[in-house]
Amino acid sequence: MAKVMMYSTGVCPYCVMAERLLKSKGVADIEKVRVDLDPPRRREMEERTGRRTVPQIYVGGTHVGGFDDLAALDRAGGLDPLLAAP
């Protein structure tokens, strides 16, 4: 299963929904980067993604986007193959 990394904050309902969706797909370990506690990592997120909102989710080396992007990818049938990649 591909490695999953999520930029998040302590109070973020979309982060919780993203984590719930990923866990329903069998993802046991999500690397969470708390950008509210680590300003340099927030800058890193903004530079890498061009976005300022959380969550920002990476599956393997692929930037999926936020929760709406993740859910849309799942509905389109693209999330399972992405997660299955080594």
Predicted regions and their residues:
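Local sequence-structure signature of Cys/Sec-based thiol-disulfide redox active-site neighborhoods
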Residues: 1-29
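Short alpha-helical
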Residues: 13, 40, 65
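Alpha-helix termination/capping residues and helix-transition junctions
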Residues: 24-27, 51, 64
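Chalcogenol-based redox active-site neighborhoods
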Residues: 25, 47, 80
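Thiol-based oxidoreductase modules, predominantly thioredoxin-like and allied folds used
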Residues: 29-42
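Thiol/disulfide oxidoreductase modules built on the thioredoxin-like
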Residues: 47-53
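Non-catalytic, surface beta->alpha helical segment in thiol-disulfide oxidoreductase systems
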Residues: 59-85
